Amino acid sequence: MNQFPWLSIIILFPLFAAFFIPLLPSRENQTVRWYTLGICLLDFLVMSYIFGYYYDFHNSSFQFKESIEWIPTIGFKWALGVDGLSMGLILLTGLVTTLAVLAAWPITCNPKLFYFLMLVMYSGQIGLFTSQDLFLFFLMWELELIPIYLLISLWGGRRRLYAATKFIFYTAIGSLFLFIATFTVCFYGANIATWHFEDLAEKEYPFILEKILYLGFGFAYAVKLPIIPFHTWLPDTHGEAHYSTCMLLAGILLKMGGYGWIRINMTLFPNAHAYFAPWLVILGTVQIIYAASVCLSQKNLKRRIAYSSISHMGFVLIGICSFTNIGLSGAICQMISHGLIGASLFFLAGTTYDRIRTVSLSEMGGIALKMPKMFSMFTGFSLASLALPTMSGFVAEMMIFLGIISSTFYSPSFRCFIILFQALGVILTPIYLLSMLRQMFYGVDTFHFESMSFIDSGPREVFIIVSLFIPVIIIGLYPNILLSIWQNALSIL
């Protein structure tokens, strides 16, 4: 069954389907909505089926391999494969994108272009997580750039052009470094370019060149993850983008940076990774505390959630640099956990804005009684974000803590220092999240409910939140269901 081109199908199906959107009837938005939702759902069900029935979880190597000559003169191939590391992120992409399409139901301004861009992004994201060729990885990385820019600039808030320009400026610079590093790696020491990950892993470089290449790739990932000081595009982008776009940004786009760091930097440049790891651990710790502290001063609901995402990504960086399987496993778990939680919080923030027409926390208050379902869902995911036991965030952060504690790569004093400041970041998290809940749902009746018509969450919104909340609880209660996916794959990294 592995000989069947399953991966090509789940990558190209949404892309080809996107080009049929202009042919759909223009009078009714319902047609393009259901068409796009059906495409995403079918693709998600197909990937779930093939991974559930045909993936060998005891095999640590890549499966469903495909390799087709594309540009023979430079050795470029359409090379795909899936292992435990990429499978979880592919399934996350399918789930979040499908629900983001459903979340975009209220979009009425040029819906054909909106859903076209979402399907193009969907293909690019799956393509990136399945790429086994470095040039193909680069192409899929770049495929995200224009759709995200258009989604922000055309369907965003009042400062959407500023946010979109800032986003493309940061990511374009990161892409330039990625482009230079990619071609340097592939052409170094060979007359014919070597693009396949397995072949590149066998190359050796002078230490100074390895460090330069590590930083070149790392800069691109640092923008996407993001890592301070390359993070300032994120609050502006989340603050202005439509909440369905925010779901894709928080749920999937940020994870591309973490995935690239593990798949390329750790694997291809192990000596440079060991050299920079202590500094990255310190940077990740500073990021946790800094972003959590800035959260407390944010009066804009979406910007507060954006800074909380930056803080949580600091844990991912620490786990990647822990040099332990449990720490690295925790980093991957944190990426998936945050993908679910972050997407949910931005969706809830957006649907709240649809009702009260403000994201200013100082203008909110006392809406719990009129919107009890919204209040319950916001509370549940806020508790998940602060890593409450029985939820996925707790499992991920605990594994990262254990990974850095048990790491023999670092001295005991360094580990104690990092754990101490990580704990401080963990303490700050409930402060800004519970404060957010208090400002939104408790306190004075700001909106004079007797003269306003409030509508609580409807079936569509409840379905989206429940679909994201169920895996958060399952991972929190039975983490081995998720961890077993990549356990064997991590043993060979």
From Swiss-Prot:
Note the topology in the membrane: Multi-pass membrane protein
Q: Which reaction does it catalyse?
A: a plastoquinone + NADH + (n+1) H(+)(in) = a plastoquinol + NAD(+) + n H(+)(out); a plastoquinone + NADPH + (n+1) H(+)(in) = a plastoquinol + NADP(+) + n H(+)(out)
Q: Pfam families per the record?
A: Proton_antipo_M (PF00361)
Q: What is its main location?
A: plastid
Q: What is its EC number?
A: 7.1.1.-
Share an example GO biological-process annotation for this protein.
electron transport coupled proton transport
Question: Where does this one sit in the cell?
Answer: Plastid, Chloroplast thylakoid membrane
Molecular function as annotated in GO: NADH dehydrogenase (ubiquinone) activity; ubiquinone binding
Annotated Gene Ontology cellular components are:
chloroplast thylakoid membrane
Q: Which UniProt keywords apply?
A: Chloroplast, Membrane, NAD, NADP, Plastid, Plastoquinone, Quinone, Thylakoid, Translocase, Transmembrane, Transmembrane helix
Entry's transmembrane regions = 4-24, 34-54, 87-107, 111-131, 134-154, 167-187, 212-232, 242-262, 276-296, 313-333, 334-354, 385-405, 417-437, 462-482
Q: Which family does it belong to?
A: Belongs to the complex I subunit 4 family.
Protein's name according to its UniProt entry:
NAD(P)H-quinone oxidoreductase chain 4, chloroplastic
